[in-house]
Regions:
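A conserved hydrophobic secondary-structure block that centers on an alpha-helix together
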Residues: 1-36, 43
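Acidic/His metal-coordination segments adjacent to aromatic residues that form catalytic metal sites
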Residues: 47-52, 96-100, 145-156
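Zinc-dependent metallopeptidase catalytic helix centered on the HExxH motif
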Residues: 100-109
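N-terminal carbohydrate-binding/catalytic regions of secreted carbohydrate-active enzymes
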Residues: 20, 26-30, 45-64, 86
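A ubiquitous short alpha-helical element
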Residues: 56, 102-103, 156-159
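Aromatic (Trp/Tyr) and acidic
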Residues: 1-6, 10-14, 54, 60-89, ...
């Protein structure tokens, strides 16, 4: 269901996008969305990746969020309210994305990091359903803020892909504010974005090329940069990790002297080095997450 729900939501959203410009194609996409959704209902549970030679894989443990988004997307694609009931049932099964409030997690254990399904249910739901979805978002935000007792107002766990979690927190805070008009988390939303753009212990933006006049990674773990010399503008990096994680990863080593050594003395570390795949690798899903958030913010101006 964790994979089928993702497919159902992708095809369902695409069916809506192409409904007017290419109705025949839209119908085919809708059929595939429904087929994927049925598969997920028939096979509840998770489908983890199976690595060939890599020592690491994506250890996803949750699936209700995927089926919730799949069902909510089918509400828009089909107009059938029965899918809304399914989505609400899944939302109630996992009201808060489990990493929120935790200090650690396995690699991609609770994915996606942000549950957009709650927002999609809110868009289609009754007043009572809208209020419940907003309360689910609020509970998650409160859990993270409860751990943000530091100068950077950061309450996320610094596991692998911490930038993903940071962007996801900011996304959820933004959507909660949009849904409710409640600004109580706005300073933490801003702090998360500030962190990604360079207001962090290293003074380094976690987004390559942004801001243009700022400090960002020039030696990321990316073959396009290391072999072709091309800048991956807009790519969001994994971000800092706990020292304990970095120190125990296999096959990792710095190729150059650590230019940020004076700032890597605490419990989290970051290196702008092609050899550090844990903190300096551009990530596609995180970049997509951030693109969604930045686009929403631009549209709201």
């Amino acid at each position: 269901a964790s994979t089928a729900g993702k497919y159902a939501s992708a095809f369902g959203i695409a069916a809506v996008v192409f409904a007017k410009t290419d109705p025949a194609f839209s119908d085919k996409l809708k059929e595939r969305a429904l087929a994927a959704y049925r598969l997920g209902r028939e096979h509840p549970g998770v489908c983890q990746t199976a690595p060939g030679v890599s020592p690491y894989f994506y250890e996803e443990d949750n699936w209700h969020d995927d089926m919730e988004l799949g069902a909510a997307s089918l509400v828009a694609a089909t107009g059938q309210k029965s899918f809304l009931n399914d989505a609400i049932a899944d939302a109630r099964a996992e009201p808060v994305t489990p990493w929120m409030g935790k200090d650690t997690a396995n690699h991609y254990q609770w994915y996606p990091w942000h549950n957009n399904g709650h927002y999609e249910v809110w868009r289609h739901g009754t007043a009572a359903q809208k209020a419940q979805m907003a309360s689910f978002y609020r509970r998650g935000l409160e859990a993270v803020v409860g751990r943000a007792n530091n100068g950077f107002r950061m309450g996320i766990p610094f596991i692998w892909c911490s930038s993903n979690l940071t962007a996801s927190f900011a996304t959820q805070a933004y959507l909660y504010r949009k849904m409710t008009g409640d600004n109580r988390f706005r300073e933490y939303e801003a702090a998360a974005l500030d962190w990604l753009l360079g207001a962090n212990p290293w003074g380094v933006s976690m987004i390559i090329g942004l801001p243009g006049s700022g400090t960002f990674a020039h030696d990321p773990h990316a073959v396009i940069t290391s072999r072709m010399g091309l800048q991956l503008t807009g790519g969001m990096l994994d971000g800092p990790v706990y020292r304990s994680i970095y120190g125990n990863l296999k096959g990792i080593s710095l190729h150059n002297a650590d230019e940020y050594a004076p700032f890597n003395t605490g419990f989290i570390v970051y290196h702008d080095d092609v050899g550090d795949y844990s903190t300096d690798e551009p990530i596609m899903d995180g970049t997509a997450n951030l693109t969604y958030l930045f686009a929403a913010m631009a549209g709201a101006r």
